[in-house]
Amino acid sequence: MRKLALIAIGLAALCGTAAAQDAKAVIANAQKALGDVKSITYSGSAKDVAFQQCGANKANMVCLGTHDPMRPIDNYVRLIDLTAPASRATGATNNIGPGGSTTITPGTFSQQITAQQADVSQPWAGSLEFYLTPWGFLKGAAENNATATKRSGHTVLTWSPSVKAASGKSYVVSGYVDDKNMIDRVETQLGDNVMGDMQIVATYSGWKDFGGGMAPSKIVQTRGGWPFFEVTVTAAKANPPDVATIAMPPAPAGGRGGPGGPGRGPAPALMVTTEKLGDGLWKLTTGAGSYDSIIVEFKDYVMMLEAGQPQARATAYVAEVKKLVPNKPIRYVWNSHPHSDHTGGLPVLVEEGATIVTQKNNVAFLEKALNTPRTLLDDPLAKTPKKAKFEAVDEKKVYSDGTRTVEIYHVAPVPHSNGLTIAYIPKEKILFQGDFTVTPGEPANDHVKALGPIVLDKLKLDFDKYIPVHAGNAPQTKADFLKALGR
């Protein structure tokens, strides 16, 4: 028996060695097919998205994981330096004005991956954009003991960076090499607070020699199954002579750049302040810049209006709820809309067993996101997995048990999201809303202008307090709302 075991171990070792040797040949052949370049630059047009920021597209009311339609990027140019290693991409695009404006203004797309960020021992969120490229992937495969397997007509190279996920699990990067030694697809995963083990896939098609460099004609990247980035390549050049100049970081400019790595160090402790709004009714805040929550006590349960974000704030709020209302479960948590700054605390409430109340256009995205495995994460929901539960709001939903009433209304059309709802508490005449903040002394922004006729003329809500999820410097009232609207 011992002899058979030793033989099995020996065969496994031989297979592993053979796989590694085979991988080296596959890598060498693929690098040769791509021109054995030290650097490459390619250009054309591109598109990106505001990720996890469902917009207000009239053609498709269902909120996707991204802002639809995608944002165009003209004069897109990307340099990949395999020696440094480093990458830089730039382009001309547009931005939506700040502060609730819908005005489109010119902007700049800029994505920089430095040699330090591209180090495989550094946070994967900051380096993966380099290693998702065919050239970067092959470099990583050559330097990190890739293995090779056959799958679906491709040779699949697989390797792992040295950096580990929050859970301690290794990240895995796989690249699909076709029979012409071209990279068709590169995929990996990243732990995302809302989307769990988020699958990141980059596909490469239409490979051709652009008269100076082999490059794909089309690049498409998805995250969590949702559109994320696209490039149509019209020119490419291998080993450009001015690599150092092109790779220099751009001057600071406006615009939405590429994804960066997570912050470091422990977050400061959050001090929760409780304001009593009525019997069995409280507002929780952590001060300026907070994402506030309203806690509603019903006869047999608690309803939490907005979960707070990030998870640390949601955790602090849940602890405060248990002090305020001991022995009653948080049965519901209302989500005003599915933007990333309003969903960050939801995993904490899912772990608590709360049902998420959200507009029906948001359910498909949030259900898929929150029920994805979380093996790369180290949060409570990852340690104690629970299935996210939902109650969908169509145009209106009322929660009442004879002691307390909360009314939820879908507000549309508004420019911010197809899945926006507001919460109305009739007894105390409170309107609680996300992203419709008014600034005292200033006219209403485009979001507030859209909300005004819905709340005042269509729904005819009788409210005195106008409370935003985004904590302001001073309390807001209906009078402030009317003044901003010029009524």
Question: What residue ranges belong to the model's regions?
Answer:
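Active-site metal-binding motif and surrounding structural segment of the metallo-beta-lactamase
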Residues: 301, 312-357, 458-464
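Gly/Pro-enriched, hydrophobic low-complexity segments
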Residues: 152-247, 421-426, 433-434, 439-457
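Core dinuclear metal-dependent hydrolase active-site scaffold
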Residues: 273-279, 395-432
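Divalent-metal (often Zn2+) His-rich catalytic cores of metallo-beta-lactamase-fold enzymes
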Residues: 348, 452-487
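Conserved beta-strand hairpin/beta-sheet module of binuclear metal-dependent hydrolase folds
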Residues: 275-321, 420-438
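N-terminal mature ectodomain segment of secretory-pathway/periplasmic proteins
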Residues: 25, 29-118, 146-147
